[in-house]
Amino acid sequence: MRPERTWFPLTGAVTPGAAAGPKPTGPIDPLAGPKQVLAGRVVTMDDALSVRPDGVVYIDRGCVVAVQDRGQPAPAGFEQVKVVLTGGTIYPGLIELHNHLSYNVLPLWSPVPKRFEHRGQWADHKEYRPKISGPMTVIGEHRDAAGEADLVPALVRYVECKCLLGGVTTSQGIMLASNAGIRRYYRGLIRNVEQTDDPALSEAQSRIADVDAEDAQRFLTQLRKEDSCYLLHLSEGVTDPKQPEKSQAREHFCSLEIAPGQWALTNAFCGIHAAGLLPEDFAVLAGRHASMVWSPLSNLLLYGGTARVEAARKEGVRIGLGSDWSPTGSKNLLGELKVAWLYSQHVLNGLFSARDLVAMVTREAASILKWDGLVGRIAAGARADLLVIHGTAGDPYEALIRAREVDIRLVMINGAARYGTSALMGPLAPKDQTVRVGGESRALYLKQQQADPDVAAVSLRTAKTTLREALLDIAKLAKEAEKPKPAPARRALDAPVRPVWSLALDEIPDQGED
């Protein structure tokens, strides 16, 4: 369990009094929404994996009250609520357990210059700084004439909307760091697995750096304290089974063995990538009820191979799915589903069914987070995180995998309709913004009671324009950043500190304490 946090907005001064003040509590949107009724084919992803061909989902105060067939009487209190006919198939919102969201303004690193053996190599390649870390550092630390981090709000708005347009309702967070030594996750539209601000949804930890052998015991102690999961980048690279001792990627997994047969692994452990593990390593994970997140496209582009998910499946290791980041991964989780499907069909002889893969981004991901029953399924008592795609014909699981962004009719989080066609958004949300997807108009509702004011002031259209111009002028912005800045004026010791926020990127050293 984490200590109590203080909420700091992107704007305004931080004073000692404010630092001690209350933070927002409760979910990303208050559980106070109106009664709503959605009709369509309902893919519940419940324990029975039931599908209702002509179903109705009843929602009140952000939660699902009931899921029934159209012919059944409405639950008490819903008799006069108008039924919204979706004309589509209703799924739980997609849950992504691996994504570096801040980087999702960048294009694909194409072609990847060579096949790498482990993650320690590609970050040192000569192309990495000019194409990835350099632009992101400039965007994350850029200051306008007033000294404000003017590109950060645009980036946050853009990458969150990119999630919504792909049906994602839960992902990893965007870490911010301030000049006052404060670190926090951005509180936004989609659920953040590391900072839910919801007592019913326990918060995950995440770590990119490897755990060294001398730290394994301390890591195990930390794992035993977790009430959600610990998302650790694990064994990111490839291993030749004929020469496993030469694999640096697998070496980091072996570092988790504290003593013969004693591992720094529990049911809270979730290994992201796990690409360098051998079949026998998945038996170790399974024996300790650990789980993994599969990111096939990024693995294939960087390493020419991916996790031995067939071994994970054989051993009963629970698997989630993540698109990683846009430089080497899919543009969203909907795209990563397609990569996983193609890999399963053409490399693994159809090992994973379409239903298996849909489970990885719904109920299985929720189980990894210890959020069973609350998200990842459509059932009474679950949060109304929903995704609707066009049409009700054919296999419902293949329909989701084959769906394109233009097929998405509605995305709802905590009962708040956030994105969809005008026909569905009209009766469910106030007018806000529009965006064109595949040549068709879609509606967005991005307003929140507790939004960061800087981000709230940025429309998606403005965010796109701002980021496009910044990336086109990235060399110029980089040179400006290198110019010496005037020393800040002195202030009284008790004067408020004006925080200036930057993106806390993977390559940038820590700038404060959690």
Predicted regions and their residues:
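Active-site microenvironment of metallo-dependent hydrolases
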Residues: 1-77, 99-201, 220-223, 234, ...
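Short, charged, surface-exposed secondary-structure boundary motifs
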Residues: 301-308, 330-332, 397-399, 421
